Amino acid sequence: MRLARVSPSNGEIVIVAVNDADVQKLDLTQVENCHKLCDILHSPDPVGLSKFLIDPNAAPIPIDEVRFLAPIDQQEVWAAGVTYKRSQVARMEESEAGASHYDMVYTADRPEIFFKANAARVSGPGQVVRVRHDSKWSVPEPEFTLVISPQGNLVGHTIGNDMSARDIEGENPLYLPQAKLYNQCAGLGPCIQLAEGELDKEATTIKMTIERSGKSVFKGETNLGQMAREFKDLIQWLTRENDIPTGAFMMTGTGIVPPDEFTLFDGDSVTIEIAGIGTLTNPVVKESYPE
């Protein structure tokens, strides 16, 4: 079952169940203290509650008549790094000074985890993601993203775009926060696939296409079977000595990295598709500022 925050043509924001061709409105007034998407996600039974809240009196809305919004309320966004072999190699190549650190963290018990964004820095479907004006080498990182309740339970999954300034991080690993965390540095959406049973990781494909002036300039594909970390372990490390009272999204690393000679340009378009969830597309903006 998939849930989303959408805006129909009348401009209101509603929570819906997402089908292939349409969406069904959820009537949150049926349950006390249920006002936002996160209230459903953080309930004891998100799937059961969602099914109960589907409004039988509301006609389904064609999917092309709604605008999908970022599926985030007040949660934090965190990210894990170097969880795929391809990412390990790329990070070692970009940073001579920190190459050995990236090599070691790939196999270490403790993963790399960093704070990525708050809700104000997140872009939803169709909204711009940003390249820092002081970066000459930036890429999108398509990531399977966990949705975690305040109790540390995995309640769903979505698509994440971890915008990254590779030259800034490569210059010095201590610059990681500046390479990762800035305005419009993350994309999330279009919906949340509620957690129901075990995922077929090999069948959960992740694809990314980057277009420039209407033409594809990069394509890549991987699947969750290539990931070296388990979701439960990442959540355990995230929540160790670290409460998440408003819940969290956790990007789980990338297995798709464009070649070293590639960088994003202003006006590019990034499309990420994950099987079972959907497609997230964001235009890219890079502005010029006087030094």
Q: How should these model regions be labeled?
A:
Residues 1-80, 233, 282-291:
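Generic N-terminal segment detector
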Residues 3, 144, 272:
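Short tryptophan-centered beta-strand motifs in secreted/extracellular beta-sheet-rich domains
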Residues 7-10, 17-22, 148-152, 211-214, ...:
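Short acidic-glycine loop/turn motifs at beta-strand connectors
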Residues 9, 164-291:
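Catalytic-pocket segment enriched in acidic/His residues
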Residues 46-214:
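Active-site microenvironments in enzyme catalytic cores
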